[in-house]
From Swiss-Prot:
The gene is rpaR. It comes from the Bacteria. GO terms for molecular function: DNA binding. This is HTH-type quorum sensing-dependent transcriptional regulator RpaR. Residues 174-239 form the HTH luxR-type domain. GO terms for biological process: quorum sensing; regulation of DNA-templated transcription. Pfam families: Autoind_bind (PF03472), GerE (PF00196). PANTHER family: DNA-BINDING TRANSCRIPTIONAL ACTIVATOR DEVR_DOSR (PTHR44688:SF16). Keywords: DNA-binding, Quorum sensing, Repressor, Transcription, Transcription regulation. Responds to the quorum-sensing autoinducer 4-coumaroyl-homoserine lactone to regulate expression of several genes. Represses expression of rpaI in the absence of the inducer. Residues 198-217 bind DNA. Belongs to the autoinducer-regulated transcriptional regulatory protein family. PROSITE patterns: HTH_LUXR_2 (PS50043).
């Protein structure tokens, strides 16, 4: 049986979605790039929409733009006049780049951005806006002649949403659970914060110095601290111990 184009794109997208939660960032990005490339998209970017308070570099989650284009885009502050992210901020619907509204005569700066993009092989593109409680973002992909059929666009939307969500989750700092340290570890860190040596703590608590050192090492490991001093500092910051 010959698989139709719609079914093919649907299958590829679902296979990607099924694998997302098992992938770490490098493997996820590699699979995402491979999938969009099969659709004719040779470049992409996943980023928050720039604002007065934050520029594109610090908002970028994954950058697949040509290096020279990204550098030019940032140095020329193209995000301030680019019709694609401008339109993305006002809609929840994915759209083709050429459908982003602007007037060539009244908005020559916007036209210049699109013209310069084409010089880097980014002739036509597809943008998927995403709006979260903490801000807006977009996945924008482009190429010289990408497949923009409804089936391909639907697949690109689906994989982009899942890829962005997974990368956002992976980029968040892993929270330290307040209850990870045992009462004994907290007690020993409390004494360490007061400047007591391992031997002095062992005398105070009537345990061996070796046991004290073991608990200090375990506490540092759980707090992702490089040494005893860093562990004490982090425990104080988290409110696990007090001076």
């Amino acid at each position: 049986m010959i698989v139709g184009e719609d079914q093919l794109w649907g299958r590829r997208a679902l296979e990607f979605v099924d694998s997302v939660e098992r992938l770490e960032a490098p493997a996820l990005i590699s699979r995402f790039e491979s999938l969009i490339a099969s659709c004719g998209f040779t470049a992409y970017i996943m980023a928050g929409l720039p604002s007065r308070n934050a520029g594109l570099p610090e908002l970028t989650l994954a950058n697949g733009w040509p290096r020279d284009w990204f550098d030019l885009y940032v140095s020329e502050n193209f995000s301030a006049v680019d019709p694609v992210p401008r339109h993305g901020a006002t809609t929840v619907h994915p759209f083709v780049w050429s459908d982003a509204p602007y007037d060539r005569d009244r908005d020559p700066a916007a036209h210049r951005v699109m013209t310069r993009a084409a010089e880097f092989g980014l002739v036509e593109g597809y943008c998927i806006p995403l709006h979260y409680d903490d801000g807006s973002a977009a996945i924008s992909m482009a190429g010289k002649d990408p497949d923009l059929s409804p089936a391909a666009r639907g697949a690109m939307q689906l994989v982009s949403i899942y890829a962005h969500s997974r990368l956002r989750a992976l980029s968040r700092p892993k929270p330290i659970r307040r209850n990870r340290l045992t009462p004994r570890e907290c007690e020993i860190l409390q004494w360490a914060a007061q400047g007591k040596t391992a031997w002095e703590i062992s005398v105070i608590l009537c345990i061996t110095e070796r046991t004290v050192k073991f608990h200090l090492i375990e506490a540092a490991r759980k707090l992702d601290a490089a040494n005893r001093t860093a562990a004490v500092a982090k425990a104080l910051t988290l409110g696990l111990i007090r001076l």
